[in-house]
Amino acid sequence: MRLESVAKFHSPKSPMMSDSPRATASDSLSGTDVMAAMGMAQSQAGFGMAAFCGKHELSQNDKQKAINYLMQFAHKVSGKYRGVAKLEGNTKAKVLQVLATFAYADYCRSAATPGARCRDCHGTGRAVDIAKTEQWGRVVEKECGRCKGVGYSRMPASAAYRAVTMLIPNLTQPTWSRTVKPLYDALVVQCHKEESIADNILSTVTR
């Protein structure tokens, strides 16, 4: 079973899981099986499970748990980022909370997010390659140039920058870009990494 099946399981129309075989191909995972598998995955990949469940609106509690996990990670690696490492006590903690909150919000975006769907590909991540279509006489697609194939626009990092300047008024855009934004980007990437870890663990325990 993959993580995407967890979201389907929580849908009222999906009381049984049939996409992942157990002993035989005809077996289905019952609700008890799914809950047990999720419990095992959460014990081994709490961050990734919380991130995914919060992303899919399965639990408001998981959203906050994911942000807390992300803040812990941010504290752990903040020494590598000069713009954050030099901050003191309470200010540093608040900045890391802002970065974690905005980074998680960026991770949660999808083509279904209101206003986020790519205008060029309409959420498909694909666009017509006009030159090759004319050359070959048939429709040839390519990765959408606007959204880079994901189907939606990312949350502007400028939103996080504006929030951070409420705590560090003298933080200039160039300094943000060089010394703080790299941490923000790393937090977004970490969310995706943790989701991937959770997905692999869930797949393993339901194999």
Where do the model's predicted regions map?
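Short cysteine-rich clusters marking metal-coordination/redox-active sites
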Residues: 118-121, 144-147
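Transmembrane alpha-helical hairpins and terminal membrane-anchor modules
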Residues: 139-145, 153
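Intrinsically disordered, low-complexity regions
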Residues: 3-6, 136, 150, 168
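Long, charge-rich boundary regions
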Residues: 148-207
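N-terminal low-complexity, intrinsically disordered patches enriched in charged
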Residues: 132-134, 160
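N-terminal alpha-helical interaction blocks
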Residues: 1-108
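Short, flexible, mixed-charge glycine/proline-rich loop motifs
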Residues: 101-117, 123-125, 134-139
